[in-house]
Structures are given as C-alpha cells and as structure tokens.
Amino acid sequence: MSKRITRVLFKISGESLSTDSGNRIDEVRLSRLVSELRAVRNSDIETALVIGGGNILRGLAQQKELQINRVSADQMGMLATLINGMAVADALKADDIPCLLTSTLSCPQLADLYTPQKSEEALSQGKVLICTTGAGSPYLTTDTGAALRACELKADILLKATMHVDGVYDKDPLMFTDAVKYDRISYKDFVAQGLGVMDVSAVSLCMDSNIPIRVFSFVKHSLEQAIFDENIGTLICGDA
C-alpha cells in the first residue's frame, strides 16, 4: 500500500480481552490493548475501534442453548459489546487517553449514540473512537458493523485482529494442515470463494468503498505492526 495511512479502524474480538482460565475481561489483556492503542495514537493516526462481545456471549451460538429467539440472542450479543466497550473506555481514561464511547443502540446513561458527524469530530480531536453494539441490527455481525463504520468514517484501512489464525487461508487452517495462506487476495476472489475469517458482506461493503482490509494475528503482532508492516497477515484489496 503506497497511500499514507492517517485513519484506521480496528475490529477487535471480545476474545482478545478474555483468558482460557475464565476471566471474561482480563486485566493484563485489557492493559495490553490500551497500551497498543496509545502507541497507534502517538503515531498521529486517527484511531477507531469496533469491539466484539464473544468473551461474554455469542448470540447465534448460544441461541438454541438458551432457548431464545434469534433477534433476542443477537441483541444480547450487542449488549455484550457495550460491556466490553465500557471496560476499554474506562481503561483508556485511567491512562489519560481521550476517547469517545459510542453505541448504535440508544443507551444515554452508558454511551453516546453513534453518529458519523460526532465520531468524525472525536477522531479529528485525537480521541480514540470506540464503536459498540455492532451494526445495531440483528442478523448482522460485528464484522459487518466494522465495515459500515469504516465506510462511514472513510478509514484508510480496516484492520481485523484475530486470535486463532494469522490471515486468510484457502481453507480452515485449524482443520486442514495443508491449508495455504494468502499474502494478498482481491475482494472479488474472496467473495467468489466464500472464504472464512471475515464476513462476505463486510468484504463486499469495503469493496464498494475501496477500503482495504488486513487480517492479522493479535497473538503474534501488535496493532501498530498491522498498520506499518505490509508483510504480516493477509491484505484484501482491489487487486491481488
């Protein structure tokens, strides 16, 4: 990528805040995220963050288990992202990092209602923008919500941090030892092949706005590396 990056949007999974030992929001992992967001902000890059809620509840996965309907399950998942967002916002403020916590659902006692205008203003003021509750509608994932925010805010790149893989593969590398990783793949090829890791709808949205996506491992790499090191993860873009 030759274009200078000045505004990024990170999609961070809720799992990145939790541990295998059962801590839904782990102090060490939260501290790491705050430290890395500070590093990105200190590089004079406007920083937005969309966070998932899988460490607390996975709406679709737990729908049958909890015997609730799909809409309610998805709405519960949205609220889980708000809980994570509140934790991140308070941790940022405790470290003297200005931020704006937003929600696509109206929760005035907890977060500002998301609007592109208010979010643009926060970014231009150097605040870390935290976007919660996904796209604000059931049946749409936080990946799609992240793509929508990236398009609305005209982000230079969408960076998806994953906990299980280090990029896009031709098949699931956790199941197939011969899976081949792509260093770079076009939007159209990704959609045509129906590859995993990123929702096809999210990729299609970014394709329409020509916003590149980098999928990378948050276990192996930092947020800052994902911006500046073109050799990590997989870049999904207009040409391969």
UniProtKB/Swiss-Prot annotation:
Question: Which top-level enzyme class is recorded in the Swiss-Prot or TrEMBL entry?
Answer: transferase
Keyword Kinase assigned to the entry: answer is: yes
Pfam short name (any one): AA_kinase
Under the GO molecular function aspect, what terms does this record hold?
ATP binding; UMP kinase activity
Name the keywords, alphabetized: ATP-binding, Cytoplasm, Kinase, Nucleotide-binding, Pyrimidine biosynthesis, Transferase
Q: Show the HAMAP family listed in the entry.
A: PyrH_B
Query: What is the name of this protein?
Result: Uridylate kinase
Organism listed in the record? Chlamydia caviae (strain ATCC VR-813 / DSM 19441 / 03DC25 / GPIC)
